[in-house]
């Protein structure tokens, strides 16, 4: 049974959660990336398909996708423009609402794969201060800086298995 759902704003500009389930009896993987693109409650995009393929290969029954920023953009430059025009995100209601969804998904996930890519070097503040089971945090590969987790559409082998993050300032900057 394939289940698809998403939590998207009424204006359709922000996505807070994306879920794909193919086996409810198996565990779930959360992928945390930079920002959502076109996937929604019905349609998958390339990133979603890649995450599904990784999770199936690892024996999981579903994925959740959350993002550091909730703004839906196909290109990094569109996100940068939104960030520049938006101002202080840490006081923005969409950002705060998004972080509350991320917190919930992190706690529900059996495995968390950090995968936001090189457009956001280092680690976001909400992960540094969160009260999470840190053993859940993993990555596929790190970017050339040795700190930032690569995005699933990066130049990655399809045979990768998640590696555990050592969440501290020495690893994440």
Enumerate the language-model features and the residues they cover:
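Short, well-ordered beta-to-alpha junction loops that form the rim of enzyme active sites
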Residues: 33-34, 68, 116-119
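Amphipathic coiled-coil/heptad-repeat helices and related helical stalk/stem segments
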Residues: 14, 47-48, 95-98
């Amino acid at each position: 049974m394939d289940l698809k759902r998403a939590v998207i704003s009424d204006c359709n500009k922000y996505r807070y959660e994306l879920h794909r389930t193919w086996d409810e009896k198996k565990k779930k993987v959360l992928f945390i990336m930079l920002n959502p693109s076109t996937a929604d409650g019905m349609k998958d995009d390339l990133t979603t398909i890649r995450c599904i393929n990784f999770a199936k290969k690892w024996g999981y029954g579903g994925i959740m996708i959350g993002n550091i920023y909730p703004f839906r953009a196909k290109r990094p430059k569109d996100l940068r423009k939104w960030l520049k025009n938006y101002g202080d995100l840490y006081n923005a209601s969409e950002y705060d609402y998004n972080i509350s969804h991320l917190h919930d998904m992190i706690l529900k996930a059996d495995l968390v794969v950090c995968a936001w890519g090189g457009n956001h070097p280092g680690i976001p503040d909400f992960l540094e201060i969160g009260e999470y089971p840190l053993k859940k945090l993993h990555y596929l590969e790190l970017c050339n800086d040795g700190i930032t987790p690569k995005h699933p559409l990066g130049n990655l082998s399809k045979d990768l298995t998640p590696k555990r993050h050592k969440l501290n300032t020495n690893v994440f900057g």
